[in-house]
Each structure stands twice: as structure tokens, then as C-alpha cells.
């Protein structure tokens, strides 16, 4: 049971999402949600973020690579985690009320809805629009605006939940690192000894024993794998 109830029957057409996002953000920024009868639960269910809203057309680009790179620049790998997946993963982990819990790229705070103690939640997010929504929905949480690469946690964590930005290249040309791998490294710095990392990543992450050998060895040094499983192919379908 979360702080807000998920509307399982709600379906928002893609063409309406951007307009709804903008209206919600305006009401939150201007403290007018109550004036128009909009509840936090309404916002929890309706605000969807940037994923899929790039507005680009494949035919305007010379090749598919240029198209996907332009999409990345706009979306920054952002696709909010579906509420049912967050609820399921939190139920699997069963965090205790005293646990210090992080999400290092929290979006609008989808995992937070199902955590036991709002004031024990910490994290950072680079999208200011999402930050404003998350801070509105979870006012007792310790939520910062900023880049994960510059984030300095104030406490060691018991659990890190995460759905890192997909397929972004961070680091340098000489030492590139995927956004997913960077998230793992940052989580390792944040967690206490014996802490738990609960992560959503593409199936391609660390899937090649040859080309990913170094990263696989580093992950094996930092973490002990407890369990992994695949989500349905349409789990992030808009």
C-alpha cells in the first residue's frame, strides 16, 4: 500500500502528455493545485516526464544513430519507472522503517510512494521539472536538484533503488562509462557495508563477457549478486 493509490485504469494518450505535464507543473509552481481541485494523488497518476516526448522525426536525420543521439540529448535517458514495478520491487525487499534509502536519479520519485518512512528518503535528480513534482509529492523527503556525478550523500544508505538513465555515455573519451555502470559505482560509495542495491537496467547491460569483462569484474568486486530476473518486454510501454 503506497502513500498514493495507483489508478490502474488511467491511460493518457501520448499526444496529450506534454500538455498535461505543462499544466501540472504550472499549478505546482504557482501553488494553485487546491484552487483547481487537483490532489497530490492526481499528480502522482498523471505526471509522466520527458520520456517519448522528444518531438523528433527520424526522416529529418541522416541516419538512425544521429536520430537516437538527438533523442538522448532531449530525454537524457529519462523514462519513469511504472508504479506497479516500483511497488513490486519494494515489496520484494521489504525495507524497514529505520532504513536510510536512496534513489540517485529519482525522477518524480516513483519508488518513494511505497517506502515506509518518507523522512528517511534521500536522492538527487537533474531534471528540475521532475524535482518540483517529487518535492511536492514527498515534502518530508531529502531531495536535491543536481547531477548524480556531483552528488555528495550526507548519510550512508541501507538500500539504493534505481532506474538509471538508459544508454548515456559519461566519463571521458579515454575512460568512457555507461550511465548504468556509473550508477552502480555511485551506489557502492553510498551504501553501508552489507547494503542492498536494487537496480533496473537493460538486458544488454554487462551481457558480453568479452567486451564488458572489466565492468563485470568491477561489479563482482563491489557487489554479491542475490537475484536477477527479466521484466516483461512491454513493462515500459507508453
Model-assigned labels for residue ranges:
Residues 2-70:
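Long recognition/docking surfaces used for binding and targeting
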Residues 24, 28, 69-71, 80, ...:
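Conserved short hydrophobic patches within well-ordered secondary structure
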Residues 57-62, 103-105, 186-189:
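Short hydrophobic/aromatic-rich motifs at helix boundaries and adjacent loops
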Residues 73-171, 181-182, 202:
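Conserved S-adenosyl-L-methionine
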Residues 128, 176-235:
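Conserved Class I SAM-dependent methyltransferase catalytic core
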Residues 163, 233-238:
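Short, intrinsically disordered, charge-balanced linker/junction segments flanking boundaries
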Residues 167-170, 207-209, 237-238:
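Switch/connector loops and helix/strand junctions flanking conserved nucleotide-binding motifs
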Amino acid at each position: 500500500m503506497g502513500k498514493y493509490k495507483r489508478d490502474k485504469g488511467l491511460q493518457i494518450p501520448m499526444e496529450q502528455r506534454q500538455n498535461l505535464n505543462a499544466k501540472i507543473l504550472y499549478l505546482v509552481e504557482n501553488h494553485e493545485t487546491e484552487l483547481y481541485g487537483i490532489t497530490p494523488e492526481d499528480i502522482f497518476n498523471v505526471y509522466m516526464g520527458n520520456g517519448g516526448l522528444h518531438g523528433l522525426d527520424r526522416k529529418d536525420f541522416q541516419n538512425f544513430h544521429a536520430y537516437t543521439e538527438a533523442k538522448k540529448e532531449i530525454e537524457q535517458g529519462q523514462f519513469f519507472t511504472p508504479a506497479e514495478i516500483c511497488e513490486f520491487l519494494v515489496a520484494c525487499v521489504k525495507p524497514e522503517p529505520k532504513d536510510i534509502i536512496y534513489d540517485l536519479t529519482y525522477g518524480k520519485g516513483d519508488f518513494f510512494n511505497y517506502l515506509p518512512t518518507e523522512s528517511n528518503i534521500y536522492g538527487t535528480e537533474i531534471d528540475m521539472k521532475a524535482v518540483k513534482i517529487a518535492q511536492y509529492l514527498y515534502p518530508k523527503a531529502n531531495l536535491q536538484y543536481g547531477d548524480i556525478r556531483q552528488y555528495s550523500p550526507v548519510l550512508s544508505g541501507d538500500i539504493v533503488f534505481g532506474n538509471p538513465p538508459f544508454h548515456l555515455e559519461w566519463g571521458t573519451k579515454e575512460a568512457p562509462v555507461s550511465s548504468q555502470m556509473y550508477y552502480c559505482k555511485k551506489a557502492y560509495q553510498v551504501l553501508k557495508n552489507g547494503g542492498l542495491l536494487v537496480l533496473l537496467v537493460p538486458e544488454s547491460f554487462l551481457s558480453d563477457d568479452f567486451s564488458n569483462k572489466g565492468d563485470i569484474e568491477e561489479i563482482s568486486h563491489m557487489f554479491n549478486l542475490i537475484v536477477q530476473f527479466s521484466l516483461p518486454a512491454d513493462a515500459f510501454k507508453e
